[in-house]
């Protein structure tokens, strides 16, 4: 994996890095379109699968100064991201934004999923400005994901929890804390590059990522999708969400994700309430949450 020689990696030009992974050739135009909202002052890093080297000329036309990395079709968008991080962490960027050509072929709503994330992260120059300003004003902000896509691992751990715990142990972190933390589904976000340094220092090898085709859950890429959030929290950073209007908010701990099956603890028992109250019997919990549903929806703890 080597960067295209036309893009020098010896020094950065700006303080913000945009990292794009292109796997689906029919979607790269969407990335080019939303990237226009980034404006000036951005260094571009683009990873493409080895099968798409024919796109390099087109990418070069759109982003003449981009650093382009051809990668093996392994690790989805996660391994290419780590490969870029290895190379740019010494450059001390203040901020990065990461997106990719997500399709989610196993779902009928994959297009709306992708476009919703793009719109909330890069949908307008105003949104971009508000995202960057949020990091300037809050030194504890570590990761900023699209509103509605920042989830609670407590309910959306899937089949990856053992791998998340193993990663925590590998990095010398407390694996007992991996039960509940926020993470960004889809691995598209704004973030502070330095929070990923412990992961890069762990030297995860490409061979540790399984080859394609991957199952829908339970692999190292799925675990790292969640682990990024845990890594941020464990280092004292926060994980927040941004709306298409650029409003910054804390993630909703009981949010139901429209792009995944509803977890059993959050199953809708009636149109007015969500059920998860492990300290009492289920019958009591249903009635309790029926009464308190409006408060929970507002994020008010009782």
For every predicted segment, state its role:
Residues 1-302:
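ER/Golgi luminal nucleotide-sugar-dependent glycosyltransferases, focusing on the catalytic module
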